[in-house]
Amino acid sequence: VSITCPSNVTEAACQTQAQIDTKFSNWLTTATFGGGCNGVLTNSGGAAPNHCGGTSSVTFTVTSDCEAPKTCVATFTVTNAPVVVLNCPSNATEVACQSQTSINTKFNNWLATASFSGGCNGILTNSGGAAPDHCGGTTSVTFTVTSDCEAPKTCVATFTVIDDVPIVLNCPSNATEAACQTQAQINSKFNNWLGTA
């Protein structure tokens, strides 16, 4: 009896489990044998590797009437899914006294700078919310990547608008002028006094 094992196979990660299962089942059927009397080919089978990565080692055996069983071993491997790397936006600070529209635009553009790599079928989301008030405030945003082969990855970044400087109003000192000046003089002094605020 001669037995021919399947070639060792390596499949890429990020396929569906159904795809891996089908390829594994098809791979099992590629084992062959020749010779022997009433030979029967079996395999230890088992489950296909996880689609996120792993190896199944299979023993193929031919039993026949006139010889001891013949065996061979082959492996079916799924490469490990690439690790998710989440890149958070840098914390951002904007000055106050811009329009709310301008702050909203900058906030949305900032949200879009988050990125990720790796993983299988990853989706990037964020807790978003509203931009800070253009007069001052901070919005803290959680960014999350969910994927098929890892627990969710998260990071947090902040977008801040610096609080406006409080207004300090300095009134002119109360003024008293003597009578009997011309109206032009009084008008001039009054206007000058207004300008001291």
What are the residue ranges of the model-derived segments?
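Proline-threonine-serine-rich low-complexity tracts
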Residues: 1-197
